[in-house]
Amino acid sequence: MKDFVRLQSSFLLCTILTLSEQESVSVGCTSSMFWVVAEPTLLGQDHILHSDEASLGTGCPVTNVTAKGYEFNYPATQCGIQKEVFSYVTVFYSALHCNIMHKGVTGKIPLMCIVYGSSLDTTSSTIHNNLTEFQNDPPATNSYSPWNLTNASLFGLTRIPYFQNSSVEASHQSLLLNMSHPLVHESANVAIF
């Protein structure tokens, strides 16, 4: 009976996240930093996620609570963040873990961020959509457009969230589709940071 209740709660959580069309998670990175901002209403307006119920990667806690949500700001070498380096592209992979303590429900939202550049410097990167440069810190809230998370993936499903922005050029949207990685799925859209 206990397993049935957990399964039912897991299905409800998955349904809420799948149907949610709000901007719930923003992801950013440089060649040395990785950050995520998750809204407390990630699970829907009726299910508030508390800061101690979310973690990044291998259990890294929220680093800051702001009006926009819970911030995770870590060096790209921590929290089990995975990195793949290609000729002019570095791809970072991680996951946002949700553990709804009072309901016994856990979930995982895969995250991905791409850094373009000819070298792996550790000081700065450029955000593609407005060419704003920054030094090892997430950009100010007014300096970039947040990326939408419109299809969340939970419980190891083979679908990654859509990080889509109208400024993403068509030639870059399918870049990772030719690369093998367990988080890449044929219908994935990739945001350019």
Curated annotation (Swiss-Prot):
One of its GO terms (cellular component) is extracellular region. Disulfide bonds: none annotated. Glycans are attached at N64, N130, N148, N151, N165, N178. Keywords: Glycoprotein, Secreted, Signal. InterPro entries: PLAC1_fam. It is found in: Secreted. The keyword Cell membrane does not apply. It comes from the Eukaryota. The keyword Mitochondrion does not apply. Belongs to the PLAC1 family. This is Oocyte-secreted protein 3. The lineage of its organism: Eukaryota, Metazoa, Chordata, Craniata, Vertebrata. The gene is OOSP3.
